[in-house]
From Swiss-Prot:
Motif Bipartite nuclear localization signal per record, residues: 1193-1227
Name of encoding gene: TY2B-DR1
Comp. bias regions, Low complexity: 369-382
Protein's recorded name: Transposon Ty2-DR1 Gag-Pol polyprotein
Protein function: Capsid protein (CA) is the structural component of the virus-like particle (VLP), forming the shell that encapsulates the retrotransposons dimeric RNA genome. The particles are assembled from trimer-clustered units and there are holes in the capsid shells that allow for the diffusion of macromolecules. CA also has nucleocapsid-like chaperone activity, promoting primer tRNA(i)-Met annealing to the multipartite primer-binding site (PBS), dimerization of Ty2 RNA and initiation of reverse transcription. The aspartyl protease (PR) mediates the proteolytic cleavages of the Gag and Gag-Pol polyproteins after assembly of the VLP.
Bias (Polar residues) ranges: 1-39, 49-60, 399-408, 415-435, 915-929, 1009-1024, 1065-1082
Domain RNase H Ty1/copia-type: 1625-1767
Annotated InterPro entries: DNA/RNA_pol_sf, Integrase_cat-core, PolX-like_BBD, Retrotran_Ty1/copia-like, RNaseH-like_sf, RNaseH_sf, RVT_2, TYA
Subunit (UniProt): The capsid protein forms a homotrimer, from which the VLPs are assembled. The protease is a homodimer, whose active site consists of two apposed aspartic acid residues.
Length: 1770
């Protein structure tokens, strides 16, 4: 009803469409775009001009009074939500009806018709002209406005009269729409509607009411005819005819953009910089301007930007103009770097430069005196021409007589006065419209000089000449200082007079200064005025005061000049002037002399060094710097000659004009050695420049004929196949290309041979890179397929086919597509080395097999067949008759994870790859009657360490009875660094020693007996691939010459590959005579079960042991006496350092047994022989490495024997898989399995927003997460994390710069709920961060060292936390993130200001920020080589992201640092550390109990109690606890793993969780677990049942010993020195592929601070080499820790190294430099000698039984493990 009434009572809709809102006065000259844009000064002029053109009635000059125009009473309805008008209330629709304002109805009540057919639309015409003034909207009028009778004349300068508002003029054309919008916006502002007008970003101050919407809608229709609107406006109105605000918003945005472009150009053209602000600020300002112009599609080139910047440089920066004046390729970044360098130099100089006070006597009246200086400054004011033709300097007549010519200001050079011209029109844009006062630049060269003339300068106070030829009565300068316009010193060599002889014979003389460091000879008018001579610039003459003309002056350029012909020469040579100078105290040294004295250093380095007083007794002013910057030293040019730099992409400009296949690159690779004659040794490659199409051709040699044949073939192929002619071939200068034959070939065919310059291989990058790519592919394909090396070219050819078919990163098409060829048909390609069966069409017999196994190589060039290699025939065939073998591989891929290292995240595992032993390897013979410096090699393990008698130089057969057969043992293959070494399954272990079958065995039908004694350790925790003991496959392959019958029984043997060999003779158990070992067995062997009563090995005498020869070929001088204890004496002071002093206070085991050196009863040291334990709890894993005898089945377990406790029910089960129902199994492709592992996501311990809040059913937890969420939001806003002033549209931002964000929620260890707003850095584009920046945290060794020093020195330990640390670091890159979810702005973006958590660069930004603050504000210094360790004289700080640990003797020093930190950062004190009682800390996951002056205990009991049960490992909390993490005698079977793919990924995932946690704990403080962790980590990708069980056992042991702690006690206060010791150990060959395990433990003042267990990266051939490798790994870290300790604690330090290898100590001690056994061995040994002697390192021997590093290299029996660890962890 209301809407109908409104429509019925509004007959005069068109008559009141021009009413406006009246409010307080708005100035008529207010800019209509004041909300969003800057004021335009021409707006008011345009407004007045337009308004004056409107039709007016001449008879009136003001608006007639209208008594109806009275203000209504405020409406009784409530005001709108967004506020009222400033003076009046709003009307309801009913009141609007009563006052005839119904036409301002709600837009929703209007008829929804087209724009021009709307009932509110009114088109003015001549009969109904537009009103001159409009009553306000809030003014009630009883009668509607009569448009027909309102014809008042409008005053031109008024926009409002009384309560009326001047309406805008009517739009007259589409082109004037932007100008019309300005007036319309002003009209709305004057109507008090400015706060609802959107700015260029679409923002408004309040929402409009319905009446206001109708008002704007109607007025816009009235003054903007639809047919005159621009197209984009019509498109908006056609969608929504009432959407006027969108039109205004886009109009304002367009005007704002145009206005901003204008401002940016003006700002860029008027850049000025003198160093008053920082260079960074200047760079940011300029870059911002250029970026805004670029966003508006205006690209400013680097050259233009550099020119504009150079134009505005002044002061010390002005010299850059000359530097860049001749450069054509100017880079903006380089210029900014130069500016930054000068700014930094000036900043440092200003801090260090003392104030100078110089007094002048003779010329004191010439310069103005100031409190700080009395320097005479040359002023060069040159008058500028105005618009008239007369120069401004024409008033020079008055200079001599007028007081205007004063020297009061002559000591200051006028700066360039710049008056920027305002642009008169929006469309006018002229760069450089400036008026500058011209002046010469005196200290740089100029091209404007008029030769043989003096420049007349009315502003110069002194006359300066560059040549002493005209200087009379010259005297050396001693007190005058001259500066130029840039306030740079001008050195003055001499002072004298210039004598003039003018036209009429008039002679005069003026004073002048001689300096060669100016661009012009300057003639001062003030000096001439003193002689009553003036310059008349109207007549261009020099005149006397009486008008007599003395000489003409010449105008050249902008200046006036006087010829030097009027000067009288002095007849004094320049040498004379220099001699005068040298005779005085002001003697300047020539720069070439100083250049030679200072080692031919460059100019800038010398000058900067003198400025900073780096060289004493020589000042910068003492040197003659003239022409120093351009001085060319011949010796430097010769000695420092370098190659020219290759600019990336520079080659392209020379080759753009070539078409496909016209420009080729070629190169030859080879030779490849050790190949059959039939295999090629070289290949030659060709690459087309345009298409990057590649060809390769095999070569057997590099003769001219071979190369010529290839070129003939390639040219013919290109000509016929691509209809192209080769024009240029680029190649290097090898003799195969530069010979006469090939040169003649090119000449006859008109081909240009383009050679590289001498020794410039980088210019041949295309061909070189192709060869590198092909060879990388070749090595990969051969290694993956396992094919022999002589097929290397087939791999290269296969790679070429594939590379031609793939799109390279720099091209959008493949080479084949560029060449116009079809894409590669994938159905015609097989994997390189794919096993196939080839049909034999011509068998030898009809009953012979028709199929031959082979391996696919590559598609044939000459047919539609495939090239296939047939190993049995040793040839390749081209055929299509083949069948692919499914699920077969050319070889078993082997992956061998090497060293387990720990990064800061403690989750990554790294591995090194190892090569495998091929069948065609060479075999190396070893004599079984000899021994090496290690124990004899057994079936699996080669004994780790020698103890005694391993240095004997005698070689006597210990048995004297029978000669034992010589065994052939395969030596490890030399590792090829280019072949991938990743292996999952360790392959068959090397050849094993023979075994003897004992028929009395109770378990397997016979006991396996070795022909050697038991090694020092009976077994190892390693991997093998072998059958169960007792089977014939356990026997190794012996060559025919080994099969000698010595009364041995026949035993059937088998090769490793499975081929049966004839029976060979072995020793029977009735006539065995074994030799004895030459080393004392280890602890676990000596303490073997004493119940064994049937030994089968006869023990020889000690003499035989001592005289046993060794395989080790160390020269005799490397061996020492058995009873000697060698040590290294680094210097003379070492006499005070003994082995006892090094060993003192170390947590070594207490031994009651005899020393290993006590050999009085050798038989007591020989261990009893164990029987085999095949019924182990891990499923009967065999121990084929030990010697066995029959033993009682029932006997009690003791601590020294193997013990496996059950921690999971499945561990007790036997291998019952055969009883399970059959299930579907799938053989895993191991390569694919690795890819699958990479896709496995880590365990997620956090919650997403929907999980924590949206769908969280736990209301209590949900409320806590909501509270944490709002706390995080408030913190982000408080830190100004993003720009809150503007939201960006997603479509307007480059997607690379958009970073996804998310909230993560978790519950901290202390029970608090945490919310964190993070960026998805894992999907961050590489272009948005600098990959060179690194995020540093304190190294764990540094933290442990600091804690140890704190205990010994009674330090207070304070723990701090900085809230939202990353948010304090600014971000340099332009990045955007999505707003938080509560804002509901899904399509908007926020620009980041701070380093948000999760960004790649956030950690590095925070590190640089806090580092700078600690150094500059806290007076800290970072310890060199140890990031995040800071110290000063009182406090040491360890920084781990936002956690800080403070150490200090004085607690007040810590508090002082805390106070300083709180000034900048929100710093929380977690634990102040005051008090003398026990204090508990939680530092980076370590639970620390600290009582000053007494002890420190480090553990993780609470954390492990919480985390271990969550690993889904069935722990056995009530059962018997395990007493060791693993036991010797258990091997990881390496049978082929058959498992479902999903189950495989699940188990790998489980292994990652378990080993990841174990790694974290071991790295922190459980160093005794590192060996087991490292070994299991190597099998993460081989999650067999056995590996999982061993991992469960490790986790169970961690659970049982979770309360163990690393115990430290305070060092004895009587010891003045710090003692840093490394204990080293190695276990030779106990890892797959002959690898050795090495380990080190580091101790500071008797406290274990770190440990390392890793597999040796190189293959060692003896125990000595393994020990040397272990020692060489320990020394670098030992030296680094030594530096850290000395920085943190100034006490002297003693460095010691302990090893149980006497041979290693002997080699280090020896001075013999004869050739070593191999290169690696010798290099390591020589390096150790240098490091030990050069670092004051003491090396001593430690008994093996006391070597606690043993736990790092091998599994130990329980008793031994406890003995070695109970002193330092319990």
């Amino acid at each position: 009803m209301e809407s109908q009434q409104l429509s019925q009572n509004s007959p005069n809709l068109h008559g009141s469409a021009y009413a406006s809102v009246t409010s307080k006065e708005v100035p008529s000259n207010q800019d209509p775009l004041a909300v969003s844009a800057s004021n335009l000064p021409e707006f008011d002029r345009d407004s007045t001009k337009v308004n004056s053109q409107q039709e007016t009635t001449p008879g009136t000059s003001a608006v007639p009074e209208n008594h109806h125009h009275v203000s209504p009473q405020p409406a009784s309805v409530p005001p709108p939500q967004n506020g009222q008008y400033q003076q009046h209330g709003m009307m309801t629709p009913n009141k609007a009806m009563a006052s005839n304002w119904a036409h301002y109805q709600q837009p929703s009540m209007m008829t929804c018709s087209h724009y021009q057919t709307s009932p509110a639309y009114y088109q003015p015409d001549p009969h109904y002209p537009l009103p001159q003034y409009i009553p306000p909207l809030s003014t009630s009028s009883p009668d509607p406005i009569d448009l027909k009778n309102q014809h008042s004349e409008i005053p031109q300068a008024k926009t409002k009269v009384g309560n009326n508002v001047l309406p805008p003029h009517t739009l007259t054309s589409e082109e004037n729409f932007s100008t019309w919008v300005k007036f319309y916006i002003r009209f709305l502002k004057n109507s008090n509607l400015g706060d609802i007008i959107p700015n260029d970003q679409g923002e408004i101050k309040r929402q409009m009411t319905y009446e206001e919407h109708a008002y704007i809608y109607n007025t816009f229709q009235a003054f903007a005819p639809f047919h005159l609107l621009p197209t984009w406006v019509k498109q908006i109105l056609e969608i929504n005819y009432a959407d006027i605000l969108t039109v205004l918003c886009k109009s304002v945005s367009k005007m704002q953009t145009n206005n901003q472009e204008l401002k940016d150009w003006i700002a860029l053209a008027n850049l000025e910089y003198d160093g008053s602000t920082s260079a960074d600020t200047f760079e940011i300002t300029v870059s911002t301007i250029i970026q805004r112009l670029k966003e508006n599609n205006i690209n400013v080139s680097d050259r233009l930007a550099c020119q504009l910047i150079l134009k505005g440089l002044s002061g010390d920066f002005k010299y850059l103009r000359n530097q860049y004046r001749t450069k054509t390729n100017m880079k903006l970044s380089q210029l900014f770097a130069e500016i930054q360098l000068i700014y930094d130099e000036n900043k440092i100089m200003n801090l260090n430069k003392p104030s100078q006070y110089k007094q002048h006597s003779e010329y004191k009246n010439v310069s103005r005196t100031s409190p700080n200086t009395t320097n005479t400054k040359v002023t060069t004011r040159n008058y500028q021409r105005t618009n008239s033709s007369k120069p401004r300097a024409a008033k020079a007549h008055n200079i001599a007589t007028s007081s205007k010519f004063s020297r009061v200001n002559n000591d200051h050079i006028n700066e360039s006065t710049v008056s920027s011209q305002y642009l008169s029109d929006d469309n006018e844009l002229s760069l450089g419209q400036q008026q500058k006062e011209s002046k010469p630049t005196h200290t740089i060269d100029s091209n404007d000089e008029l030769p043989d003339h003096l420049l007349i300068d009315s502003g110069a106070s002194q006359t300066l000449v560059r040549s002493a030829h005209y200087l009379h009565h010259a005297t050396p300068n001693s007190e005058i200082n001259i500066v130029d316009a840039q306030k740079q010193d001008i050195p003055i060599n001499a002072i004298g007079n210039l004598h003039f002889n003018f036209q009429n014979g008039t002679k005069t003389s003026i004073k002048a200064l001689h300096t060669p460091n100016i661009a012009y000879d300057l003639l001062s008018l003030s000096e001439l005025a003193n002689q009553n001579i003036t310059a008349c610039f109207t007549r261009n003459t020099l005149e006397r005061s009486d008008g007599t003309v003395l000489a003409p002056i010449v105008k050249h350029g902008d200046f006036y000049w006087l010829s030097k012909k009027y000067l009288i020469p002095s007849h004094i040579s320049k040498l004379t002037i220099n001699n005068v100078n040298k005779s005085k105290s002001v003697n300047k040294y020539p720069y070439p002399l100083i250049h030679r004295m200072l080692g031919h250093a460059n100019f800038r380095s010398i000058q900067k060094s003198l400025k900073k007083n780096a060289v004493t007794y020589l000042k910068e002013s003492d040197i003659e710097w003239s022409n120093a910057s351009t001085y060319q030293c011949p010796d430097c040019l010769i000695g420092k000659s370098t190659k020219h730099r290759h600019v990336k992409g520079s080659r392209l400009k020379y080759q753009e004009s070539y078409e496909p296949f016209q420009y080729l690159h070629t190169d030859i690779f080879g030779p490849v050695h050790h190949l059959p004659k039939s295999a090629p040794s070289y290949f030659i490659s060709f690459t087309d420049e345009k298409t990057r199409f590649q060809w390769v051709y095999p070569l057997h040699d590099r003769r001219e004929e071979s190369i010529l044949n290839v070129f003939t073939s390639i040219l013919a192929f290109i000509k016929n196949q691509f209809n192209a002619r080769v024009l240029v071939i680029q190649m290097d200068r090898g003799s195969e290309y530069t010979n006469k034959t090939l040169h003649k070939f090119f000449t006859n065919r008109g081909i240009t041979a383009c050679y590289t310059t001498t020794a410039d291989s980088r210019a041949h990058g295309v061909a070189e890179r192709l060869n590198r790519t092909l060879l990388n592919d070749c090595r990969t394909l051969l290694h993956c397929s396992g094919l022999p090396n002589h097929l290397w070219f087939s791999a290269v050819e296969f790679s070429t086919i594939i590379r031609n078919s793939l799109v390279s990163p720099k091209n959008d098409k493949s080479a084949r597509q560029h060449a116009g060829l079809a894409g590669l048909d994938i159905t015609t390609i097989l994997p390189f080395g794919q096993p196939v069966i080839v049909n034999n069409h011509n068998p030898d017999s009809k009953i012979h097999p028709r199929g031959i196994p082979g391996y696919a190589l590559h598609p044939s060039r000459n047919s539609y067949g495939y090239i296939i290699y047939l190993p049995s025939l040793k040839k390749t065939v081209d055929t299509t008759n083949y069948v692919i073998l499914q699920d077969k591989q050319s070889k078993l891929d082997q992956f061998n994870y090497d060293t387990l290292t720990f990064d800061d995240d403690l989750n990554r595992l790294t591995a090194h790859n190892q090569s495998f032993i091929e069948k065609n390897e060479t075999e190396q013979s070893y004599d079984q009657n000899t021994e090496s410096d290690h124990d004899y090699q057994s079936e699996i393990e080669i004994n780790s360490d020698p103890l005694v008698n391993d240095f004997s130089s005698q070689s006597i057969n210990p048995l004297q009875l029978d000669k034992e057969p010589v065994q052939k043992v395969r030596a490890p293959k030399e590792v090829d660094a280019d072949i991938s070494e990743y292996n999952i399954l360790p392959s068959t272990i090397r050849s094993r020693t023979p075994h003897i079958i004992n028929k009395e065995s109770t378990e397997m039908g016979g006991t396996i007996e070795s022909d050697t004694t038991s090694p020092r350790h009976s077994s190892t925790f390693t991997a093998r691939n072998q059958k169960r003991p007792g089977s014939p496959n356990d026997m190794i392959d012996l060559t025919s010459q080994d099969r000698v019958n010595y009364g041995l029984e026949n035993i059937k043997t088998t090769r490793l590959g499975g081929t049966e060999e004839p029976y060979i003779q072995r020793n029977s158990d009735t006539n065995i005579k074994y030799r004895t070992t030459n080393s004392t067995p280890s602890i676990d062997d000596r303490s073997s079960n004493s119940e064994s009563t049937t030994p089968i090995i006869s023990i020889e005498t000690k003499a035989a042991c001592d005289n046993t020869p060794s395989i080790d070929t160390d020269p005799p001088e490397y061996r020492s006496s058995d009873h000697a204890t060698p040590n290294i004496m680094p210097d003379k002071s070492s006499k005070n350092v003994t082995a006892d002093s090094i060993l003192d206070d170390l947590p070594l085991p207490d031994l009651t047994n005899k020393s290993p050196t006590d050999t009085s009863d050798v038989s007591k040291d020989i261990p009893h022989i164990h029987s085999r334990q095949t019924n182990s709890s891990l499923g009967g894993m065999d121990d084929s490495n030990v010697l066995t005898t029959t033993k009682s089945k029932k006997r009690s377990l003791e601590d020294n024997e193997t013990e496996i406790e059950v921690s999971r029910d499945t561990w007790n089960n036997k291998n019952m898989r055969s009883l399970e129902p059959p299930r579907s199994k799938k053989r895993i492709n191991l390569i694919a399995a690795i890819k699958g592992v990479k896709s496995i996501k880590p365990v997620r311990t956090t919650l997403r927003y929907d999980e924590a809040i949206t769908y969280n059913e736990d209301n209590k937890e949900k409320d806590r997460y909501i509270e944490a969420y709002h706390k995080e939001i408030n913190q982000l806003l408080r830190m100004n994390t993003w720009d809150t002033n503007k939201y960006y549209d997603r479509n307007d931002i480059d997607p690379k710069k958009v970073i996804n964000s998310m909230f993560i929620f978790n519950k901290k260890r202390d029970g608090t709920h945490k919310a964190r707003f993070v960026a998805r850095g894992d999907i961050q584009h590489p272009d948005t961060y600098d990959s060179d920046m690194q995020s540093n945290t304190v190294h764990h060794y540094a933290l442990m060292t600091s804690l140890s020093i704190a205990l010994d020195n009674d330090y207070y330990i304070t723990q701090l936390d900085i809230s939202s640390a990353y948010l304090y670091a600014d971000i340099k890159e332009e990045l955007y993130i999505r707003p938080p979810p509560h804002l509901g702005l899904n399509d908007k973006l926020l620009r980041l200001r701070k380093s948000l958590y999760g960004l790649k660069q956030s950690g590095a930004n925070w590190y640089e920020t806090i580092k700078s603050y600690l150094i500059n504000c806290c007076d800290m210094q970072e310890v060199r080589g140890w990031s995040c360790v800071f110290k000063n004289s009182q406090v040491t700080i360890c920084l781990f992201v936002d956690d800080m640990i403070l150490f200090s003797k004085d607690l007040n020093a810590n508090k002082k640092i805390i106070t300083t930190l709180k000034k900048q950062y929100d710093t929380k004190i977690i634990n102040l550390g005051e008090g003398d009682n026990e204090i508990q800390y939680d530092i980076l996951g370590l639970e620390i109990k600290y009582q000053r002056s007494k002890y420190m205990k480090l553990g993780m009991e609470k954390s492990l109690t919480e985390k271990l049960p969550k690993l889904n490992v069935p722990l056995n909390p009530k059962g018997k606890k395990l007493r060791a993490p693993g036991q010797p005698g258990h091997y990881i079977d390496q049978d082929e793993l058959e498992i479902d793919e999903d189950e495989y990924k699940e188990k790998v995932h489980e292994m990652q969780k378990l080993i990841g946690l174990a790694s974290y704990v071991g790295y922190k403080f459980r160093f005794d677990l590192l060996y087991y962790i490292n070994t299991l980590a190597q099998h993460i990708l081989f999650p067999s049942r056995q590996v999982l069980d061993m991992t469960y056992e490790l986790i169970q042991f961690m659970w049982d010993t979770r309360d163990k702690q690393l115990i430290w006690h305070k060092n004895k206060p009587t010891k003045p020195d710090n003692k840093l010791v490394a204990i080293s150990d190695a276990s030779y060959g106990n890892q797959p592929y002959y690898k050795s395990q090495i380990g080190n433990i580091f101790l500071l003042n008797g406290k274990v601070i770190g440990g390392k267990s890793t597999k040796a990266s190189l293959t060692c051939t003896s125990t000595t080499e393994a020990e040397i490798h272990a020692v060489s790994e320990a020394i670098p870290l030992l030296n680094n820790l030594s530096h850290l300790v000395q920085e943190l604690n100034k006490k002297p330090i003693i460095k010691g190294l302990l090893t149980d290898s006497r041979s290693t100590i002997s080699i280090i001690k020896s001075t013999n430099e004869e050739k070593f056994r191999n290169r690696f061995f010798g290099t390591k040994a020589m390096r150790l000698r240098d490091e030990v002697s050069g670092n004051n390192l003491y090396v001593y021997y430690i008994e093996t039984k006391k070597n606690i590093a043993d736990v790092m290299t091998k599994p130990l029996p329980i008793k031994t493990f406890k003995l070695l660890t109970n002193k330092w962890i319990h």
